[in-house]
Amino acid sequence: MRRISVKKLCSFCLCACAFAFLVMTFQVIELLGQFEQTEHRQQIKRFEDIKVQANAHVSDVQYPVIVWWSPLTGELGRLGECGHNRCFFTVNKSYYSHPQTKAFLFYGTDFSIESLPLPRHKQHQWALFHEESPKNNYKLFHKPLITQFNHTATFSRHSHLPLTTQHLEDINTLTAQTHLLPLSYKNHLRQTLAPVVYVQSDCDPPSDRDTYIRELMQHIQVDSYGQCLHNKDLPPHLRDSTAMDDQDFYKILAQYKFILAFENAVCDDYITEKLWRPLKLGVVPVYYGAPNIHMWLPDNQSAIVVNPNEPPKKLAQYLKRLDKNDWEYLKYLEWKHKREITNINLLKELKERPWGVQDITQDNFIDVFECMVCSRVWENIHRQEEKLPPKVWRAEESHLTCPPPKLFDFALSSSSSLRQMWGASYEQSKREARALAQMLHTNTNFTITQFWREVFTD
């Protein structure tokens, strides 16, 4: 009987402890919930305070106001220092009517006819930042619209702030041999790997690259890891687009002899990481994109430039020849082994550009773009003080231009609707650019209905 009582006592104690633990757990959860609610309320209050503060100062700003009409930076208000000049930068559109507002900044991809700061007052300057593909907003690539802007920062070398080398950190990154593998090892890997690799998941873009590469694959083996023309899998942790700069991804690409570096659009100066990546890894890029690419290559023989007027079969034959001839192949890597950049234009651009890439010691190109506009605003303020006429900046057609998309005429078993769309989209954007320029000339607000009526009566 005594032993049974002890067992009952132990059971009771265990139950009591468990109950106490549950009570304490619920109390902790409740306290955490209260804390989170309080913190959430405080965050909301802080955000509301910022909004109130920003709105409270709408009439108090003593510096030139520059409004990001596209919410690229997300900053409600910031006093930026640009050398000896200061400007107030904000995404708050209520500053449109502020007497100190001097300029509006637009991000090309977000530029929309549905929201424009109109009417455009005499002192209002427009500035365009657009470093991306023309397919993001074809309207901007036509003379009637691009010339509506006063200041530009685009991939074109002719823009006021050229961003042509936006994907290239510096010369040292280009000449480094961190990922360069011996050719003898690459030859050994050819037992299991194709000589050529392709990695793209943005299929059927305006450059029609997938059509060309599909035909090329009929004549030479290509390992395709992306969603486009896929025939080989990446490890699971590398399948997301955010892994394109992962060291493991670099190691896979570095094993190949050739990388197909085909841009999604064919425009002068439109050069992306598709070119720079293989050059940094010590792989020979087979490049199709900017027609003036030789202006930017580190060496005259650092890439194989695709001639779109020649059949892919001819390119395949050339790649096969290089694959079998080490001496000829190594000519394309001689600059890499010597760590020698012979292109004076590229060296000059990287030395003189006023911004850096992934470099905390330099300003980024968005900050430099803002300061370019700020400095020009102040230049005219000083000219006005000296009773001089204002200086006028105006974008030119060359600041953002690209020819119509051109499809390859290879026989296709199937053709996507997206592939067929780009030509029509380009022509439509041309009409839209003309119509919008006409509407802007009236300098009054307009409705979407009025705009489309102008488009279709053009």
Swiss-Prot record:
Gene3D superfamilies: Glycosyl transferase family 10, C-terminal domain. Its EC number is 2.4.1.221. It is found in: Endoplasmic reticulum membrane. Disulfide bonds join 371-374. One of its GO terms (biological process) is fucosylation. Its main location: endoplasmic reticulum. Pathway: Protein modification; protein glycosylation. It is a single-pass type II membrane protein. GO terms for molecular function: alpha-(1->3)-fucosyltransferase activity; peptide-O-fucosyltransferase activity. The chain crosses the membrane at residues 12-32. It catalyses: L-threonyl-[protein] + GDP-beta-L-fucose = 3-O-(alpha-L-fucosyl)-L-threonyl-[protein] + GDP + H(+); L-seryl-[protein] + GDP-beta-L-fucose = 3-O-(alpha-L-fucosyl)-L-seryl-[protein] + GDP + H(+). InterPro entries: Alpha-1_3-FUT_met, Glyco_tran_10_C, Glyco_tran_10_N, Glyco_trans_10, GT10-like_C_sf. Keywords: Disulfide bond, Endoplasmic reticulum, Glycoprotein, Glycosyltransferase, Membrane, Signal-anchor, Transferase, Transmembrane, Transmembrane helix. Glycans are attached at residues 92, 150, 300, 445. GO terms for cellular component: endoplasmic reticulum; endoplasmic reticulum membrane; Golgi membrane. The keyword NAD does not apply. It comes from the Eukaryota. It is an enzyme of class 2 (transferase). This is GDP-fucose protein O-fucosyltransferase 3. It comes from Danio rerio.
